[in-house]
Amino acid sequence: MSVVALIVGSLSKQSLNRHIAEQILKCAPENVQIEEIDISNLPLYSQDLDDINIPFYSRVREQIKGADAVLIASPEHNRTIPAALKNVIDIATRPHGQNVWLNKKVAIVTASPGVYGGINAGLDLRKVLTFVGAEVLAQPEVYLSKASFDLDERTTNFLKQFAQRFFQWVENK
């Protein structure tokens, strides 16, 4: 049994990226367990908190550590990573020497109703996650532009192909 953790970078209750992630996760094989990591209540990271047991921090670190892979679905805020998503990345690298991203398989999906499809956030995520030692899925890259909740056949097929590649990659431990 493989465990895939899902992190949605949007805090919106009607998140387009959550919808996209759900379409991908529908393709998960039966032997893959999906566990969403809720980032909505995480206090902002501060090094001053490294020596304090903060249950929200501990939970997130353990969920990432326990997963075989992480799927991140995120919008783009002001041409970069949403603050809540960057916060969880930072939390999971600390305290020093306890980086749970190290060698973790991570796939990135970004979507936006705009013309750029979240590519700036996707590239920044790739840069940050590579820096913290994650193994980021190289291909296929997913930057969905002009995205909406009503996915056309071409987009649906592309997401299915991405899902197939992602879950094969997860299974090759």
Language model regions located:
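N-terminal beta1-alpha1 ligand-phosphate binding loop
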Residues: 2-31
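Short beta-strand/turn micro-motifs composed of small residues
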Residues: 8, 38, 110
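Secondary-structure boundary/capping motif
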Residues: 13-16, 45, 80-81, 117-118
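A general structural signal for well-ordered alpha-helical segments in protein cores
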Residues: 17, 21, 57, 85, ...
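A generic structural motif
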Residues: 29-35, 134-135
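N-terminal beta-loop-helix "entrance" segment that forms/cooperates
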Residues: 39-55, 148
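Helix-loop-strand module that forms the ligand-binding subsite of alpha/beta enzymes
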Residues: 54-132
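Glycine-rich phosphate/pyrophosphate-binding loop and the adjoining helix
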Residues: 135-173
